[in-house]
Amino acid sequence: MKQTPAHDQYNPDLLRMIPDGLKRIVEVGCSRGALARAYLQKNPDCDYVGLEIDADSAQVASNICRSVICTDVECMAEEALAAFSPSDCWVFGDSLEHLRDPWELLRRIRNHLSPGGMIVACIPNSQHWSFQVRLNCGLFRYEDQGLLDRTHLRFFTRITMIELFESAGYRITEGYPRIFNEPDREKFLPAIRAMAQVAGADPAMAEKDAIPLQYIVKAVPVQTATP
């Protein structure tokens, strides 16, 4: 897992997606504990566990979370993950895209969720209009933050984000886009519609999918039928 710059602010939309009253939460990439602080202010009895790869950020978060482990979550042994079982919610606030194999980690987590447990995630939209413009101009240059964060290892659109969870054994039960005021996009949307039309895709859907900067989703394990 690659590290993005530390931050002291939390995503309010992500916080709203996490139900109140959960007994145990595990946040992957808790940074300095901003989201944990906000949740614990309303839910002080929650066993909020932070996993953070950056030692300095983990040290700060340890003063907020109930416990913090400085680790690369993908390198954790199964018995280490089992120590968090059962967990009501695993939170990925812009961290799934930093993983080498998010599919495998999501599959492993399924074994350690409590009945009714869930994944809550915020995922950058790689179909965003600005991403398409840069790609069209040949300017796919990594940056220190944002959609082209140099620590991003995986890129997801709305469609492939859904496929990510489904292939790992989940179904998305709730989700919505994060849309910001970006007036510059209007001059590019007609071209995005036209490109989709030529490609045989739905122009209206292509335009709609080009507007969100991120998606907030809640996913639960698919229950397998027993014989």
Where are these regions (language model features)?
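Conserved SAM-binding loop
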Residues: 12-131, 157-162, 211-221
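S-adenosyl-L-methionine-dependent methyltransferase catalytic module, highlighting the catalytic core
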Residues: 4, 9, 34, 73-74, ...
